[in-house]
Curated annotation (Swiss-Prot):
Entry-annotated residues carrying N-acetylserine: S2
Keyword Iron-sulfur included in the entry's annotation: no
Pfam families: EF-hand_1, S_100
Any one GO MF annotation of this record: vitamin D binding
GO CC terms in record: apical plasma membrane; basolateral plasma membrane; cytoplasm
Protein name: Protein S100-G
SMART domains: EFh (SM00054), S_100 (SM01394)
InterPro entries hit by this protein: EF-hand-dom_pair (IPR011992), EF_Hand_1_Ca_BS (IPR018247), EF_hand_dom (IPR002048), S-100_dom (IPR034325), S100/CaBP7/8-like_CS (IPR001751), S100_Ca-bd_sub (IPR013787)
CDD domains xref list: S-100
Organism encoding this protein: Rattus norvegicus (Rat)
Sequence ranges assigned to domain EF-hand in this UniProt record: 13-48, 45-79
PROSITE patterns registered for this protein in UniProt: EF_HAND_1 (PS00018), EF_HAND_2 (PS50222), S100_CABP (PS00303)
Gene: S100g
Binding-site residues, Ca(2+) 1: Q26, E31
Length: 79
């Protein structure tokens, strides 16, 4: 999938993966991994990349990524 997606498309992608387990408004680390593997596979060249990405995205340190936190990632990809 191209990183050039509209904000609406990215919100839909986020919601699809966030709904897999737990809070449907948050991505767990496993949900983020599934999203990245499916939508942006070139970003996961090493398993440590996911850990680093998750730490970077989880700004409030609650162990999950909200849409607002994910949106920052999407904006970086779109540049």
């Amino acid at each position: 999938m191209s990183a050039k997606k509209s904000p609406e498309e990215m919100k839909s992608i986020f919601q699809k993966y966030a709904a897999k387990e737990g809070d449907p408004n948050q991505l767990s680390k496993e949900e983020l991994k599934l999203l990245i593997q499916s939508e942006f596979p070139s970003l996961l060249k090493a398993s440590s990349t996911l850990d680093n990405l998750f730490k970077e995205l989880d700004k409030n340190g609650d162990g999950e990524v909200s849409y607002e936190e994910f949106e920052v990632f999407f904006k970086k990809l779109s540049q």
